[in-house]
């Protein structure tokens, strides 16, 4: 899941796939498509036969625009939104001050987690701008009521609540290195993508780390400009 697409069927919230999997590209063309839960099971089984474990990622609290386009009530502003069709980071994220947001995410996780028998579940946690939270009365009330210092600690609060759901289902949580900000969730494995520093910091606190610095391991570019 991301700002650009939601690509898995959630039976309790059908608009996630119906709306979140359809994007109008910058050139006017339409990109669409999602996996049904049965298709996910087929992919997981195919991978397992080849000794590959598929690890799902449901991005939160940021990179959530596809979900918020389908269900804008879980944002800070109420929308309306459109799926992002260009590079960049989206300011609109899940509202951390709304308890209904956590109910929504728990329902989603309880459908997704059983589809993936592996040990790990990735929650993203990266690139979550705080501009909406800083302006949102509900989020500011949450910060006050939970005795949090700022929006960075609010993100940590958010991740901790999600971690409890994941642990209750017998999974271990993975998140990008931004989950270090405001205090790291106790069981988290950190994927350090912005460099090596986050991984070193997490390891020094006794956490498992996966080093994925963007300069070396994000294989999304051609080998040379000529290609």
Can you name each region flagged by the protein language model?
Residues 56, 121, 173-175, 190-191, ...:
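Hydrophobic faces of well-ordered beta-strands that scaffold small-molecule active sites
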Residues 110-112, 162-163, 177-179, 197-199:
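Generic recognition of flexible, low-complexity loop/linker segments
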Residues 1-169:
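Substrate-binding cleft of carbohydrate-active enzyme catalytic domains
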